[in-house]
Amino acid sequence: MKPVLAEILKLRGSTSWAVAVLLPVASVVSACIFVRPDGWRLLWIRSVGFYGMALLPVGLAVLASLVWRVEHRGSNWNVLMSTPVPTWRTVVAKTAAIWLLASGMQLVLVLAVAAVGVGALGLPGAPPGLCLAAGALTAVACAPACALQSAISAFTRSFALPVAAGLCLTGVGTTMLLAHVPGIWLLPHALVTRTTQIGALERGSATGFTVQDLTWGSAAATVGTAAILTGIVIAATTLALNRTDARN
């Protein structure tokens, strides 16, 4: 826990906090610009649409670059790699820091939906349990993408290159989902996109790809897939860092 806390403390004054707040808030606000949602379900659907297909996965890439940027300054990399701390702990700590920020984005999204729904739209009652459940499940699904983006950011000084890679992976994932390519959800970025839409629609035709119902089975499958993919990426990153200086 201490390594993760240390990584979070490194982000004091970082723009990562602004990214984690502004992207989900902008998504919810934009959901109300052209068409006024007349219910909680429609507000949620419109909020997670473009957010899940582009903003969130690319946002994870930006957060990963910000988390690793401090290590690529001056001689910080040499100091990091020469410490007695096992490489896997560093990789896990970085991934966890990125994932915590991603989870914060999901919390902000849910809170923004509640605030806009009650304060601006005057919707009756409170947001349905779907919002909380889907938000929590999406946070879990972000873990593999956080690990992959962390790995990409670890191997380059460039801030923009990992973001560009994240944009490309997001585009590939969304395109392949729209093309109904079997198993594409095993791509971390596609898993994020698919999970953001879970339970939001009764039929997948509204998004162009199949949308799962939110059930215990679909939730368990998402959690299991996320855990396995995250473990694989972290193990591969650790092995690669142990074998190379990883500097460009």
PLM region descriptions:
Residues 1-5, 43-51, 76-88, 110-113, ...:
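Hydrophobic alpha-helical transmembrane segments
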Residues 1-21, 245-247:
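Aromatic- and glycine-rich beta-strand/loop motifs that create alpha-glucan
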Residues 10, 69, 80-82, 149, ...:
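Helix-capping/transition residues at the boundaries of transmembrane alpha-helices
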Residues 20-24, 94-95, 166-167:
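Residue-level recognition of transmembrane alpha-helices
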Residues 25-60, 64-65, 92, 96-159, ...:
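Secretory targeting signals
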Residues 38, 163-248:
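Terminal transmembrane helical anchor/hairpin motif
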Residues 65-99:
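Helix-loop-helix units of permease transmembrane domains in multi-pass membrane transporters
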